[in-house]
């Protein structure tokens, strides 16, 4: 089984200030000859590539076509692609609690980050304010197919009462990191219960004050049934 392939590359420095065009010829996963616009010729990378380089360089039309690719291919496509590739997209972050079938409680947290561009991103897990690095597993950054990317970062946990977990995301599109917080369900329910009780007690206090001021105002008014002075 033999495999041959060729790749075409455009390298840009400071926009189109300096453009380099490359064509790489690969045989069985080994590059044997390539064209470099900085050189203007085909260059052999192995002994196998020497006859090919000699053949390509002996054909003026082949050389002219590859030399013209800097303008006709690289610069032309740069004007089309640059607005898309230079636009930054902010990531969206969600936390999912995962549970193994044999365990009665959550044992993993997944921080799902998607919709961001460029692909360089940093996702961190914190437990009770301390960064976790030992129990963290991450997928590669994956393309979404619309010039944006996604990544999944999973943290193994043994949740206890009072624990809090935070997923923090840093990206060039953000002025400050995004943080998503997760607490064990018991703690969340307890917090909601305490908030509900607190609100109920506060409501009773306001009700008592309202009744008190109402009664005071009634005492200060004259009784319309009391006998008055006849004029």
Swiss-Prot record:
Domain Ig-like C1-type: from-to ranges: 91-179
Region Connecting peptide: start-end pairs: 183-194
Record field: transmembrane: 195-219
Cytoplasmic topological intervals: 220-231
Pfam entry (one): MHC_II_beta
Disulfide bonds: 10-74, 111-167
Keyword Thylakoid among record annotations: no
Localization per Swiss-Prot or TrEMBL: Membrane
GO biological process: adaptive immune response; antigen processing and presentation of exogenous peptide antigen via MHC class II; peptide antigen assembly with MHC class II protein complex; positive regulation of immune response; positive regulation of T cell activation
Entry similarity comment: Belongs to the MHC class II family.
Protein name stated in the entry: Class II histocompatibility antigen, B-L beta chain
């Amino acid at each position: 089984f033999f495999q041959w392939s060729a790749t075409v590359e455009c390298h840009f420095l400071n926009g189109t200030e300096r453009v380099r065009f490359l064509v790489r010829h690969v045989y069985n996963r080994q590059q044997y000859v390539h064209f470099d616009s900085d050189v203007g010729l085909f260059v052999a990378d192995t002994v196998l590539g020497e006859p090919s380089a000699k053949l390509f360089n002996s054909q003026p039309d082949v050389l002219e076509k590859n030399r013209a690719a800097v303008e006709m291919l690289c610069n032309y496509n740069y004007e089309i692609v640059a607005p898309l590739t230079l636009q930054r997209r902010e990531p969206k972050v969600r936390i999912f609690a995962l549970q193994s079938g044999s365990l009665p409680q959550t044992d993993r947290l997944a921080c799902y980050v998607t919709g961001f561009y460029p692909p360089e991103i940093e996702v961190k897990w914190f437990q009770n304010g301390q960064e976790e690095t030992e129990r963290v597993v991450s997928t590669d950054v994956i393309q979404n197919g619309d010039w944006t990317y996604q990544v999944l970062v999973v943290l193994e946990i043994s949740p206890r009462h009072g624990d809090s977990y935070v997923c923090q995301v840093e990206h060039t599109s953000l002025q400050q990191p995004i943080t998503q917080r997760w607490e064990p369900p018991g703690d969340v329910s307890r917090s909601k219960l305490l908030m509900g009780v607190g609100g109920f007690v506060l409501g009773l206090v306001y009700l008592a004050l309202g009744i008190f001021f109402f009664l005071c105002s009634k005492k200060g008014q004259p009784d319309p049934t009391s006998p008055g002075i006849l004029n």
